[in-house]
Amino acid sequence: MTYRTLCILAFTALISACSSRPTGPTTPPPESVSAISKWETSGRVGIRTKNDAVSGNFNWQKDPKTFALSIVGPFGQGATHLNQSNDGVVTLAYEDTVVTGNNPETLLQQELGWEFPVNQVTYWIRGLAYPNSAAKISKDPDSQLPNKIEQDGWLITYSNFTKVDGLSLPQKMQVSNPPFRVNLIINQWTIQ
């Protein structure tokens, strides 16, 4: 082999090593909000009960069988973690306490005094009515996005939406059933 041939082969190898390679198949974004099977959201939360008020940051990861919800107060104080594993076991961790059960709503009510319908909120946070009960939905006449859902004794109001992968998802919302009220300001959405 000549010197020139070696240089051409080395240059070709160098160029092909630097070229971009496909990273594998990517999951296309969902075609509708109801088709979102896995999501993560984070932002600010304010929770008001009859006797207490809590504010902080939240992060919520959800896939079809599991979820992990964390609420952390100002300066990292007062962290509360609610998780559901693949086998349906729900764990609530707060302060120095860890309890398990099979129903997130029951754990939150018994341990913290919070009435928070976790199963329904996984739909409401996406701007959808919970499919297993009747709902009254009011929509904005221009955008046709929901501005209010009344369901199971709860009032869900939406005051702002944001576009994520071409879909409109809530950015600011309130879930209330007096005296319990939750305000969410969502800073980030990741969907699949």
UniProtKB/Swiss-Prot annotation:
It is a lipid-anchor. Keywords: Cell outer membrane, Chaperone, Lipoprotein, Membrane, Palmitate, Protein transport, Signal, Transport. InterPro entries: LolA/LolB/LppX, OM_lipoprot_LolB. GO terms for cellular component: cell outer membrane. A lipid is attached at C18 (N-palmitoyl cysteine). A lipid is attached at C18 (S-diacylglycerol cysteine). It is found in: Cell outer membrane. Belongs to the LolB family. This is Outer-membrane lipoprotein LolB. It comes from Marinomonas sp. (strain MWYL1).
